[in-house]
């Protein structure tokens, strides 16, 4: 709805410029903007869920397990990217002065995010019957299109798109910052800011590579199958290896 008359080649550079500025100003300003904007996003989400209640149909959630436990547990591994933000929390942990408080905040964020995700998924399943509910992209946007308050107010998705755009900018800025930070410590660089421009340019080029929604879905599924399992497995392996080295050093020092 927003900027629908503009070409994607015009919209993406604007987004990438805003993301680059966010990554350049640093983590603390991004966190402050996030703290100011999150209450508004929460109010919009809560209002959306309340307005969706008249459209709920309890019969739509059946069958509860869909195609069975196997499809949920084994085939559900393809959606492991939903938990990729946990890796980001570990990357940003060194910025926290109080590690114990940071861990509590991290767990709190995971619980809140999980609760919101369950509520959104439940609302989606209560509105869209099975098997239509199996295939969805940006479910909150699809839910917002259902809301109609008479002829006067029938485009609630406009509000969602505004809030979603700001959240994407904040989210992407944090990831670009984290990526540049990881490269900084990996290659022992003095500053991370010179890395922002090439990262933003490469990200913008990759964003325009899919020629259609079908290609985008295919690339996303490929990432979920190959990239994210490796991304989760490597920290676990390095963790076990580091613990083994630490225990060996402790034994040598004691002996």
Where are the language model's segments positioned?
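Extracellular/periplasmic helix-loop-helix junctions in multi-pass membrane proteins
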Residues: 188-193, 208-228
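Hydrophobic alpha-helical segments and their helix-loop junctions in multi-pass secondary transporters
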Residues: 20-23, 40-65, 125, 237-250
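Membrane helical hairpin/interfacial module
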Residues: 1-9, 14-18
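Membrane-interface loop-to-helix entry segments
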Residues: 9-10, 22-51, 223-234
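Helix-loop-helix connectors at the membrane interface of multi-pass transporters/channels
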Residues: 1-6, 97-116, 175-199
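Selective recognition of specific alpha-helical transmembrane segments in multi-pass small-molecule
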Residues: 19-20, 39-53, 107-133, 194-210
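Hydrophobic, membrane-embedded alpha-helices of multi-pass small-molecule transporters
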Residues: 11-16, 24, 51-55, 64-116, ...
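Membrane-interface interhelical connector segments
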Residues: 127-157
